[in-house]
Amino acid sequence: MVRSPPTDSVGLVTQHKATFEEPLPLVCGRELPRYELVYETYGELNREGTNAILVCHALSGNHHAAGYHSEHDRKPGWWETCIGPGKPLDTNRFFVVCSNNLGGCHGSTGPASINPETGKPYGDQFPIVTVRDWVRSQARLADELGIRQWAAVAGGSLGGMQAMQWAIDYPERLRHAIVIAAAPRLSAQNIGFNEVARQAIMSDPEFHGGRYYDYGVSPRRGLAVARMLGHITYLSDDAMRAKFGRDLRGDMSFDFEQVDFEVESYLRYQGQRFVQDFDANTYLLMTKALDYFDPAADHDDDFSAALAHIQCSTLLLSFSSDWRFAPARSREILRALLEHNKPVSYMEIEATQGHDAFLMPIQRYLEAFSAYMGNVAREVGA
């Protein structure tokens, strides 16, 4: 419970909802006739409208990036380390916006929303959405908020991919792209991880072909296993060794149902906690969006060509122990930008926390991020 938020927090926040009546054409060939985006904002938009920052969330994230919804919240938003007074995304200087992506399960239109054609939840009938679709919907949200150009679009992991897509699709609408712990596209290994996660969900007897809402159930076991698998990939071997080693919770049980090792207990806890407020169909959609992200596909498999016409400056940050999106993947982006003489700053940060390092209060990371954003603030008069 938070009785008084820390002084460097944005404090208590409220969510907003934008409704769009104009159909949204999707990359898959279908369209959403009407949709809603839930979002939060932190800080104030300046008179010139030049200090807006769009934050894009990763696979399991949502619009609640910072602050607290009530004094009873146990934890703040997912990027509390980076959003707030005096932090890299300084809300004394910037107006920060974060929305829940289409297909999400925290208020934006998604599989659990009512399909206007049937009067029932979309379920398996919700269209496949891509990073490009998300960016298009975010551009409409920017229009709704009166933001012609973002000072920066920022995100880690899948959020960083959205920042890249913004730079490609709307080059004139952002001054900076902040791409953290990301990649130009998924490797075969990463696609494989996502497929195993999807199979865990779809093989759960309670999945019912994605129509489980109609049965009043949820494929919780499959979703928990998917989350357990994902969580392993977000941590480094060093971090897991330091945190758990081979520590036992007690004597060996010689039983499959019992939990012997501390790491088993941790993963089961993460899985069970995750299923409390995340939807299985959304997990399927988010992993597919990750798999399909490939800007080079429209340019004869030439990623450099995909970035040829961007106009923004780019900050690339990677973490030494991240093996899901290793530093080598960020350097691929770096080389593609340099090939076209695009302004770019890059830093590989020594960190033991693995892929999830972008969410953590690592001093060198926050210093580098803050220094860059300080320059952005001065550039836009914030």
Curated annotation (Swiss-Prot):
UniProt keyword Amino-acid biosynthesis, yes or no: yes
Location relative to the cell: Cytoplasm
EC numbers for this chain: 2.3.1.46
Entry's Gene Ontology BP terms: homoserine metabolic process; methionine biosynthetic process
Keywords: Acyltransferase, Amino-acid biosynthesis, Cytoplasm, Methionine biosynthesis, Transferase
Reaction(s) catalysed (UniProt annotation): L-homoserine + succinyl-CoA = O-succinyl-L-homoserine + CoA
Record's protein name: Homoserine O-succinyltransferase
Upper classification of the organism: Bacteria, Pseudomonadati, Pseudomonadota, Gammaproteobacteria, Chromatiales
